Amino acid sequence: MNTNSIKRQTYLSPLLFLCCVVIGVTQSKAQQAPTEKDMSAYLMVFHNDDTHSLHMALSHDGYTFTALNDGNSIIAGDTIADQKGIRDPHIYRGPEGAFYLAMTDLHIYAQQAGYRDAEWEREDYGWGNNRGLVLMKSPDLIHWKRANLRLDNQAPFFQDIGCAWAPETTFDEEAGKLMIYFTMRHHTDAAKLYYAYVNDDFDRLESTPQILFEYPDEKITALDADITKVGDKYRMFYVSHDGVAGIKQAVSDRANGGYTFDPRWYDPEPQACEAPNVWKRIGEEKWVLMYDCYGQSVHNFGFSETTDFVNFQNLGQFNQGIMKTTNFTSPKHGAVIHLTKAETDKLIEKWGL
């Protein structure tokens, strides 16, 4: 054996080891999500009935929100959805720091907009029938990768689904996987809540959808689930159609089931509301329950605040109390996450505020 070769190998090995360590540390840092102490702003995503597109708004204090792009859409629904429109956007920051957008592939005014000949995609499948979701993943909220997911293709049992609505994402710590959950009904039956695991690329399911929660009376629809882990409990707020549509809460020790029914109504609204979303105030032990007040003539978001998930203070609706908007009205089905200053600055640089 060539002794020069031996010396060269001996000399290079420590360098290779050091490179591997540096790369490993760099990857570890890149995959570590920022913590609450790093956060300085709030990002709200929502859709608009006029555009059926994704909109975003920012707030530095959690009380006053300003829409990006002067209130215009950030991502046009007709560029990403099979039905040429999206509804019910939800945003989630994964444990590795990436952002996950999940949306309903549905345009309820597609006929008027000239996207289809009939009012709905299929006859005899009821209001707002659809079969798909739009899933998007981004490292920075600017560059997005998209997948269109058809739920009726997941198993023979799902071929007759009447809707797939309001998808949301969370991380199941026990399974160590991303989990999406959504509203689904068969034909025109009462809707129930389902979940499935999704791959890291956020473009395909890794399990067949299973029941997450159904109302005790199976003839009553349960929809629009929103799961938040607080302490060691998973708190799921959802919509019940047990009378006037409103918000109820169910609690479990795990993400993917076991939720205990609570008959109490948690919203203070006299008219129908839907789309609950819970978000925490930065640096405080306070959580905001936000919901879409759709049963009134002018749609709006309503807000209630809690420290213990038992007692809730009614904060009123946008521009009727302490919660304000500056340049948009009638948002639909929203969700809120925290952002760092750097992430906020990048969004403002891209879209303007």
Tell what function each PLM region has.
Residues 1-34:
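Bacterial Sec-dependent N-terminal signal peptides
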Residues 31-353:
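Carbohydrate-active catalytic/glycan-binding domains of CAZyme proteins
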